């Protein structure tokens, strides 16, 4: 299986959301869609984008940048999912969307995620001005 994420911008290109789609990759490497795509972020005002995903066992982590959700420019947010035991392809949200960055002044961007184990992820990102040297 593979998970694809992308940003979908609305008509005025100011508001955008992060979407994901699960794919099955056959032996001959032909992808087929599993289920329907869905929006990952719950905060839908302004721009959400620059998403990254990682998987481990039955867990999938998604992280992204969100404009003004943390009160100051871009912040980093994440959501964990697990695959459904009832059938292949269904993703079930684990917990709620969480803010990753604790320093909120200025821009936090370019998140990257790796799953360390099921339900444990590590996320790294750029933080501008956090050390006050710009």
Tell me what each language-model feature is.
Residues 1-134:
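Extracellular, repeat-based ectodomains that mediate carbohydrate processing or recognition
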């Amino acid at each position: 299986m593979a998970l694809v994420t992308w940003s979908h911008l609305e008509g005025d290109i100011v508001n955008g959301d992060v979407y994901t789609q699960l794919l099955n990759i056959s032996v001959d490497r032909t992808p087929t869609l599993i289920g329907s795509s869905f929006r990952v972020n719950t905060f839908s005002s302004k721009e959400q984008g620059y998403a990254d995903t990682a998987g481990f066992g039955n867990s999938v982590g998604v992280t992204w940048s969100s404009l003004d959700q943390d009160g100051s420019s871009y912040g980093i947010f994440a959501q964990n999912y697990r695959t459904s035991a009832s059938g292949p392809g269904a993703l079930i949200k684990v917990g709620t969307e969480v803010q990753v960055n604790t320093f909120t002044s200025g821009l936090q961007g370019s998140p990257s995620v790796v799953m360390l184990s099921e339900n444990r992820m590590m996320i790294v990102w750029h933080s501008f001005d956090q050390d006050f040297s710009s």
